[in-house]
């Protein structure tokens, strides 16, 4: 076991601060319409040019284990915000950094860290309520296009493409990304569905960076049974291996020996395979599996139909053009089974007419939407592999942002909302908080201008001057960094999803509170640690 380095009090917080400063410096340069790019060295293949906070944050590792702890904490802000809203990671990092710097100054002056954290938490809740209050619902494809454009770094073609895709599959529809074969990026609507179950084991992932499994031209084994013994799977595994195609197993569960064997096959590359839990419960699970079977042209292996896994053949398998599996969702893009899907939808329509239960009607409507909505596939085109990766990241951000906007509405973008809420928070804090809790709230008040200040500085102007000017303007008015003017943000199309703003604020405040209340760090000792601490002293 390696020797550990233990730091207390100011030294501990200073070590965290070092890591937080370094990560923020690398990520912050990408913020706003005039944000710069960051080049990431790749061990294999060409360097990657990115403008995406979470991607940069994942790449940063420091020699100094103590400072690296600070990097890991701030990386968590980006990751949590990305998980919750799919965008806004850079804003969350900049906001958290500002809170930490402001908070450490006050702690050094003698303020109580625990009281400061309570103040930050209460102030954050007030702001979350205010953001929800100011959010406007997304009414048309123009608003969707605006959100997508901003999320993709002011790329209007991306915004228009997302709006076109949503127009085809509906605001609740599924949008999937695929690498195209040409220079042009195109939208295609195909048969498909998405359900809320992800991979059973992370060992099934094919893209470790994004933690996603993507399998093309796959066979689908559908069963309502729990699979524990590998013997039941051996015949079908052998048949699929001979075809050279991947296999996706959708079952009640896959456990023990069966799961271990599948993982081993995947890791060895014997057969590309992934296991997914079937969606729903009880009879609803059987209905959903039957829907998937209709969509993919397969059969459900079930005792109800007299079929067993041991006797399953390739003809009973479903087929999918592409299957994309994350830890939470599975998206199936199938070949054309239009007639069968249409007949199934008509059958569900009849069931809706016949049932009196409002709960049953709701669940049947959900099934109908899943089955008939289809999937909009955006085929990403680019001249080079480097451009392809960058374009896919931008499109991913834009899709996540537009879906978040549909869920919770939009607010003025470009850091404007947070700047306008600062005076309201200041008034509320003075009325409801005292002592060090009030100091905690004021730390948040002063930090709220950090994202706008960074956007302005990335555009080559004085951030402080612009922030003070924006504070004097109406709530919907802010600074357009691309054209260097003050505009109505809704009219100009500079908007952020309320969900993204809220998630970034919540996660930034949470990690900042943890850093400010840290009294001790224990990390592995290294030569770099010793040198850095000597220099810091």
Swiss-Prot record:
Check the record and name the Gene3D superfamilies matching this protein.
GroEL, GroEL-like equatorial domain, TCP-1-like chaperonin intermediate domain
Give GO MF terms, alphabetically: ATP binding; ATP-dependent protein folding chaperone; isomerase activity; unfolded protein binding
Annotated residues for binding of ATP: 30-33, 87-91, 414, 480-482, 496
Which reaction is recorded as catalysed by this protein? Answer: ATP + H2O + a folded polypeptide = ADP + phosphate + an unfolded polypeptide
A biological process (GO) annotation for this entry?
protein refolding
The enzyme's first-digit EC class, named in words, is isomerase
Q: Which CDD domains match?
A: GroEL
Alphabetized UniProt keyword annotations: ATP-binding, Chaperone, Cytoplasm, Isomerase, Nucleotide-binding, Plasmid
InterPro entries in alphabetical order: Chaperonin_Cpn60_CS (IPR018370), Cpn60/GroEL (IPR001844), Cpn60/GroEL/TCP-1 (IPR002423), GroEL-like_apical_dom_sf (IPR027409), GROEL-like_equatorial_sf (IPR027413), TCP-1-like_intermed_sf (IPR027410)
Q: Does the keyword Isomerase apply?
A: yes
Q: Where in the cell is it found?
A: Cytoplasm
What cellular-component terms does GO give this entry? cytoplasm
Its Enzyme Commission number(s) read: 5.6.1.7
Q: What family is it from? A: Belongs to the chaperonin (HSP60) family.
* Binding partners and assembly: Forms a cylinder of 14 subunits composed of two heptameric rings stacked back-to-back. Interacts with the co-chaperonin GroES.
Role according to the record: Together with its co-chaperonin GroES, plays an essential role in assisting protein folding. The GroEL-GroES system forms a nano-cage that allows encapsulation of the non-native substrate proteins and provides a physical environment optimized to promote and accelerate protein folding.
Name of the protein described by the UniProt record: Chaperonin GroEL 3
